[in-house]
Amino acid sequence: VNTPNPLLPIIARDGDNIIVQGPITIDNVVSVTQRGAALFDQPHCVIDLGKVTEVDSTIISMLLEWLRAARQGGHQLEFVNMPASLASLIQLYDVAELIPVTPRHTEHQTAI
């Protein structure tokens, strides 16, 4: 049985979204940064961070690198479902104006 390692992050496309799951720390941030940037293939990419389980300050550099890579490729990124621990780091490092965050990602719903 091939069980995913809970210590290794998963980055995968789910429709129009890019889902990031697991820890993002100094131990894996370079790999995660490269793997994530490779998925920026649409004009507007939604990055769902709701399943990120652990962060350290290196995630800030990852998000900024993703924004730079997306801008160079003509893409726009939107980060959604940000964990409180990451939101705190963004405030601590005073980069909230640089990182576009949507507080909660909701699907378009039709009134019945």
Question: Residue ranges of each PLM-predicted region?
Answer:
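STAS-like cytosolic regulatory interaction modules
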Residues: 1-55, 65-112
